[in-house]
Design a protein with these regions (language model features):
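Extracellular/periplasm-exposed beta-strand and loop segments of Gram-negative cell-envelope proteins
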Residues: 19, 202-208, 253, 271
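Flexible, solvent-exposed loop segments that connect beta-strands
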Residues: 243, 278-282
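C-terminal structured domain segments
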Residues: 249-279
């Protein structure tokens, strides 16, 4: 929920190890360790203009079927705020305090954290995996205040049956929520950085957005390892505590991936959407969209000289 492809990619400098670390003695207990970092600037912000953001994530794999990770990001700098330099970077990285003064030069930044895990359940023939992701604003970890955080639990079943057509089908279900009745709109927002956790005016985190709850499901039938037909369903409810009149958004789609030849792939999707969001437009709205993509994979032969 902290970082997704819901928004335009951030132009950034990234450091990421290709293979996991195996640290003597420590990896005996924590298993393989992955560490990922990035630093870049955000676009489309007005209050303030041109802020920067950094993020880092640490994940460990203590057991064969269990993985857990923690992550954090911090938006800092921007027009009228502290300049972007090593001092403000390290202050944003290490500070545990907060500033409520709008435009304050000593503002540590807009900080948020995340906790995620993935567990492939035992005694299920390694076919069922449960997982969750989270987002917490101005908390050192989502577990520090579970009720303030947004959560996105999910389940993945790699095979619905042992043989026949069901053996070629997988199923995924997720139920994200960010609505907090006691503290509306706390996720993906900030008092000083008023454009919130966005890039090009789109939320960088989960598609569920601010103060909403919903669920999403995918049912996929695999024709071959490279070809499939997928049914998608998504429903979201916008809380009236933040948005006047609330709202509902529902969409259903069919996606097909087909290989026309070993080097050419056809990918197409049709989606139907129905939504009722009074603050945007009165009455029930409906729309249908479709797209087709053709991908060519050239065969490049390596020659030894």
């Amino acid at each position: 929920m902290l970082y997704s492809d819901n928004a335009e990619p951030i132009y950034s400098f990234r450091i990421n190890r290709v293979e996991p670390w195996y640290i003597p003695f420590i990896s005996r207990f924590l298993g393989p360790i992955r560490y990922d970092n990035f630093l870049g600037d955000l676009k489309g912000h007005v209050h303030p203009n041109a802020p920067w953001v950094f993020g880092d994530k640490l994940s460990v794999h203590p057991f064969n079927d269990f993985e857990i990770g923690i992550a954090r990001t911090c938006t800092f700098g921007g027009e009228g705020y502290s300049p972007v330099n090593f001092h403000t970077f390290f202050k944003c990285f290490f500070s545990a305090g907060s500033s409520t003064l709008s435009g304050a030069k000593e503002d540590a930044g807009d900080r948020r954290t995340s906790l995620d895990f993935r567990w492939r359940l035992p005694y299920m023939q390694k076919t069922v995996t449960i997982y969750t992701d989270s987002n917490a604003d101005d908390d050192i970890n989502p577990l520090a205040n579970v009720r303030r955080a947004g959560w996105q639990p999910g389940i993945y079943i790699s095979h619905l049956g042992k043989s026949g057509p069901l053996n070629k089908m997988d199923f995924r279900f997720e139920a994200p929520y960010t609505n907090q009745p006691h503290n509306a709109g706390i996720n993906y927002t900030n008092g000083n950085y008023r454009d919130g956790w966005t890039n090009q005016q789109n939320v960088i985190g989960s598609w569920i957005g601010r103060d909403s709850t919903g669920y999403q499901a995918w049912l996929t039938y695999w024709l071959t390892p490279r070809e499939n037909v997928q049914l998608q369903y998504r429903d979201a409810k916008i809380d009236t505590a933040l948005w006047p009149g609330g709202g509902t958004q529902t969409d259903f789609g069919v996606n097909v991936i087909k290989r026309l030849s070993p080097n050419i792939e056809l990918n197409g999707m049709v989606q139907y959407e129905r939504y009722l969001i009074p603050i945007l437009r009165p009455g029930v709205q409906r729309d249908t969209s479709a797209w087709v993509k053709i991908t060519w994979y050239p065969q490049i032969q390596k020659r030894l000289f």
